């Protein structure tokens, strides 16, 4: 049996292969200025991910509107089973692998599976890993995360390898929205090397210079959210750094 990869995932893979890295902007549907954010990022992001850790109101309406404003692929990043809408293009079908609560490991995605099938949403199978300092953020609290210490990059690497053996094609190394500091470079590199699958990095990435470092270390996708909410115009410089790093990384890899 051949594994089928959907249109959105294929498009994202092509961006990563040709440009070295992709840029996702996370929009919380509960943010009052989501329209403003969508307008600012539409020319710079490769995709929009929609989600929040605490409650969601009017998800159908907000998702449809963001899709119309941006014209970009809209991917759901559900914080719970209610974070799914037929208005999206795809969903990050994920397991919060290092949660202390099996609800977030397996029960929540299982409960949402039939709804996803009913809506005909494309799924991107993904391991979601909570990295220090995620315990100080909303997702760390709600998801009861047994955070991976930054000083133990090999733990994230082994989780990522495990995810690849489970058949997942994406790993999200998450420091948490508004995190004091991002996932370190060594952890990104080890996770990429061991798993060989797409590595998404988010949380605490506030400057183009930091984004550049993360891509050069092995990140395939950079996610910004809080930064975008505070300064929507910052995405232009962020995109430049991510794409430059992507091309520099491709050149570096071609010489090996």
Curated annotation (Swiss-Prot):
GO BP annotations, alphabetical order: glycerophospholipid biosynthetic process
Pfam families: PcrB
EC number(s) per entry: 2.5.1.41
Pathway in which this enzyme or protein is active: Membrane lipid metabolism; glycerophospholipid metabolism
Cystine connections: none
Gene Ontology CC entries for this record: cytoplasm
Protein origin, superkingdom: Archaea
Cofactors that this protein relies on: Mg(2+)
Residues binding Mg(2+), per UniProt: 28, 53
Binding site for sn-glycerol 1-phosphate: 172-178, 203-204, 225-226
Chemical reaction(s) catalysed: sn-glycerol 1-phosphate + (2E,6E,10E)-geranylgeranyl diphosphate = sn-3-O-(geranylgeranyl)glycerol 1-phosphate + diphosphate
Top-level enzyme category: transferase
Main location: cytoplasm
Keywords: Cytoplasm, Lipid biosynthesis, Lipid metabolism, Magnesium, Metal-binding, Phospholipid biosynthesis, Phospholipid metabolism, Transferase
Localization, UniProt: Cytoplasm
Single GO term (MF): imidazoleglycerol-phosphate synthase activity
Protein's job: Prenyltransferase that catalyzes the transfer of the geranylgeranyl moiety of geranylgeranyl diphosphate (GGPP) to the C3 hydroxyl of sn-glycerol-1-phosphate (G1P). This reaction is the first ether-bond-formation step in the biosynthesis of archaeal membrane lipids.
Family of the protein in this entry: Belongs to the GGGP/HepGP synthase family. Group II subfamily.
Name of this chain's protein: Geranylgeranylglyceryl phosphate synthase
Organism (species): Methanococcus maripaludis (strain C5 / ATCC BAA-1333)
